[in-house]
């Protein structure tokens, strides 16, 4: 059935896709010189043009400096987390996972035999407490916590980095929806604060452009990236180079830079409308997450509230 208002996790609004700009980038990627570049094969190497565009157009906005050999292109965040979990999570590993948090990341670690320790989340993200002294890896979503949508402030980020130093654990930083922040000056990525090579950074172009683009990337120390590349090679040498080149051209033409503020305006407007609609629901004291950006809206109702009844009533009005 068709629902006018499909609130489904991960569902993409195709009207937001930059069709003309992507078509231009795809057309330019089919020039003779570009086709020669991406069609002749490159072993397991990623497109150097895309690596440079990621370095200069995306990572610099997050305060991250990286060389080509510190970046690996993937098929998206889930693929990135799979590779990372294979390298960092095993039977002797204790992994701190945000609770509530990303169930996909949790399942990947658990399937490798790691012991996952649920770590509480408050209005500032992952709580930094003594329990972290016992872990080997911590998975966090500091820019836009999944699913509560809170952002980790600078002081909490610094405390997490200090805890990682003192207790000697690695950090998987999933920079989920970092580009759709409403903040005038987005907070620096944990990776940008890392002086010891403890942070493995994950981001995605698919979340911004469209899930079908299937491009993400990992940033870490060169030896970790080489291990991830060897693991990736067991499945595929690299994500399709024609897609990588089209994405590189899209970035180089400034289309990505222009898209970010446009998406931010649209998401902010939709968020305001949703907040207004929720505030009109009488008799239900709702707690709504702070407005830090992104596409998710975290709402908490009283424990005795019948959410199933609300879902049925919402469906009658075309809301799924």
Where are the regions that the model predicts?
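Conserved glycine-rich beta-strand-loop-beta hairpin in the small C-terminal domain of fold type I
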Residues: 101, 265-275, 286-300, 307-313
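Conserved core of the PLP fold type I
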Residues: 26, 30-168, 172, 179-180, ...
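Conserved PLP-binding active-site segment of the aspartate aminotransferase-like
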Residues: 220, 298-305, 320
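PLP-dependent aminotransferase class I/II
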Residues: 199-280, 288-289
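Short glycine-rich anion-binding loops that position phosphate/pyrophosphate groups of nucleotides
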Residues: 12-13, 142-146, 207
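N-terminal "arm"/small-domain region of PLP-dependent enzymes with the aminotransferase-like
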Residues: 1-45, 316-319
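Short, contiguous acidic/charged loop-to-helix segments that flank catalytic cores in large enzymes
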Residues: 121, 147-151, 233-238, 264-265, ...
């Amino acid at each position: 059935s068709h629902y006018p208002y499909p609130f489904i996790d991960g569902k993409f609004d195709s009207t937001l896709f930059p069709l003309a700009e992507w078509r231009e980038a795809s057309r330019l990627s089919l020039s003779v010189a570009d086709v020669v570049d991406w069609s002749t094969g490159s072993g397991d190497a990623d497109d150097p043009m895309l690596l440079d565009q990621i370095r200069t157009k995306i990572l610099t906005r997050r305060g991250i400096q990286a060389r080509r050999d510190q970046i690996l292109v993937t098929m998206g965040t889930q693929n990135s987390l799979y590779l990372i979990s294979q390298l960092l999570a095993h039977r002797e590993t204790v992994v701190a996972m945000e609770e509530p948090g990303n169930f996909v990341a949790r399942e990947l670690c658990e399937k490798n035999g790691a012991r996952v320790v649920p770590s509480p989340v408050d209005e500032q993200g992952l709580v930094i407490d003594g329990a972290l002294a016992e872990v080997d890896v911590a998975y966090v979503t500091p820019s836009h916590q999944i699913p509560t949508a809170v952002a980790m402030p600078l002081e909490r980020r610094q405390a997490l980095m200090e805890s990682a130093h003192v207790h000697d654990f690695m950090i998987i930083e999933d920079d989920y929806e970092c580009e759709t922040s409403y903040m005038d000056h987005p907070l620096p990525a944990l990776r940008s604060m890392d002086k010891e090579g403890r942070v493995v950074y994950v981001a995605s172009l698919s979340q911004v452009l469209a899930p079908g683009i299937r491009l993400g990337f990992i940033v870490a120390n060169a030896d970790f990236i080489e291990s991830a590349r060897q693991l990736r090679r067991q499945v595929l040498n690299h994500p399709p180079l024609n897609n990588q080149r089209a994405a590189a051209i899209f970035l180089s033409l400034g289309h990505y830079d222009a898209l970010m503020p446009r998406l931010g305006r649209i998401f902010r407007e939709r968020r305001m409308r949703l907040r207004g609609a929720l505030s009109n629901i009488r008799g239900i004291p709702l707690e709504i997450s702070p407005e830090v950006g992104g596409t998710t809206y975290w709402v908490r109702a009283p424990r005795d509230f019948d959410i199933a009844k609300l879902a049925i009533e919402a469906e009658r009005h075309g809301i799924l």
